[in-house]
Amino acid sequence: MKKSLIALTLAALPVAAMADVTLYGTIKTGVETSRSVEHNGGQVVSVETGTGIVDLGSKIGFKGQEDLGNGLKAIWQVEQKASIAGTDSGWGNRQSFIGLKGGFGKLRVGRLNSVLKDTGDINPWDSKSDYLGVNKIAEPEARLISVRYDSPEFAGLSGSVQYALNDNVGRHNSESYHAGFNYKNGGFFVQYGGAYKRHQDVDDVKIEKYQIHRLVSGYDNDALYASVAVQQQDAKLVEDNSHNSQTEVAATLAYRFGNVTPRVSYAHGFKGSVDDAKRDNTYDQVVVGAEYDFSKRTSALVSAGWLQEGKGENKFVATAGGVGLRHKF
C-alpha cells in the first residue's frame, strides 16, 4: 500500500511542476434599502421604496500560467459572476483571456477590462444599488471582447493600449480604441484612461464620434487611500453638427484604523450630456461607510448614500443604506 502511494505521488510530480492553476473568488451579499422621490414643477410625482437581499458582485475564477522558456510565459484566466441570489448566468462573463507575458510586457486576447475600468478605484464600494456607490461617473467602464497590450514598468511608469471590434453588446457594440498610463512613486500615483469610438448607439441616440478621458491622482499606502478624478465625455451626433460634452469629478478618502476602515466618496456632474449639451443633468452624490475585517478574508460592510439629480422644482432625490458580508478565497 505504501509503495502504491509513493508511486502515485512520484507520478504526480511532473504534472504539478508543469501546471500552475489557481482557484479564487469572492462571495459577498447584503441587505439594501432605498427611497427615491421625483419632483416635477415643485410637485412630488413619484415615490419609490424598496428593501431586498442582494448579491454584491460575487465571482469565481480560475487562472494559471505555463513557463515556455527564455522568460516567456503563457497566461490564462476564466472568471465568471457567481451570484448567490441566482441572478447571473453564463461562463466567462467577467474578465477571461489567454495571452503571453515576458520582458516585453503582457499581451492578452479575450473579454478584458477596458483601460478606463482599470482606473476605477475611485469607486471602491461593494453595492448593488446605484445610490451606494459613485456609479454615475463609473458608468462608461466596461469589459470588452478585445486585444490588449500592457507594457512593463519603467521607473514607475507603465502604459496600455487596447483595441475592440464591434463584437460587444449594448452601448459598447462599436469599434473602439483605448489607451492609458500609470505612474507610481512611493505611495503617490497618477492614472489616465481614455477611449475613442465610432458609430455608437447610447440609449437610442446615434453617435458618430465619441471620446472619453479620465485622469486620477492620489496617494495609496497600507493605511491611507485618497484620490481625485476628473472625467470628460464628448460626442458628435449623427444628426447634429455640435459637440456635446459632459464633465464629472469624484473624490474618495479612506483610512484604516486597526480592523476598521471608514471611507467616504463624493461625486459631482456638471450640466450637459453626450446627447444634449444644454441638458441640465447636474448631480451630486455622497457615499459614506466602513469595513470591519474579522480576518484577512472575511469582512463586514456598512454604507449609506445620497444622490440628487437636477435642482429647484425639477429634481430627483434618493437615499439608501446597506449592510453586508464579504469572504475572499
Swiss-Prot record:
Subcellular location: Cell outer membrane
GO BP term, pick one: monoatomic ion transmembrane transport
Keyword Membrane: yes
A GO MF label: porin activity
A Pfam short name: Porin_1
Signal sequence region: 1-19
Highest taxon listed in the record's lineage: Bacteria
UniProt keywords, alphabetically: Cell outer membrane, Ion transport, Membrane, Porin, Signal, Transmembrane, Transmembrane beta strand, Transport
InterPro entries given in the database record: Gram-neg_bact_OMP, Gram_neg_porin_domain, Porin_dom_sf, Porin_Gram-ve, Porin_Gram-ve_CS, Porin_Neis
Family annotation (Gene3D superfamilies): Porin (2.40.160.10)
CC annotations in GO: cell outer membrane; pore complex
Membrane topology type: Multi-pass membrane protein
Assembly and oligomerization: Homotrimer.
Family stated for the protein in its record: Belongs to the Gram-negative porin family.
PANTHER family noted in UniProt: MAJOR OUTER MEMBRANE PROTEIN P.IA, PROTEIN YDDL-RELATED
Function in brief: Serves as a slightly cation selective porin.
Classification via NCBIfam families: porin_porB_Neis (NF040479)
Protein name: Major outer membrane protein P.IB
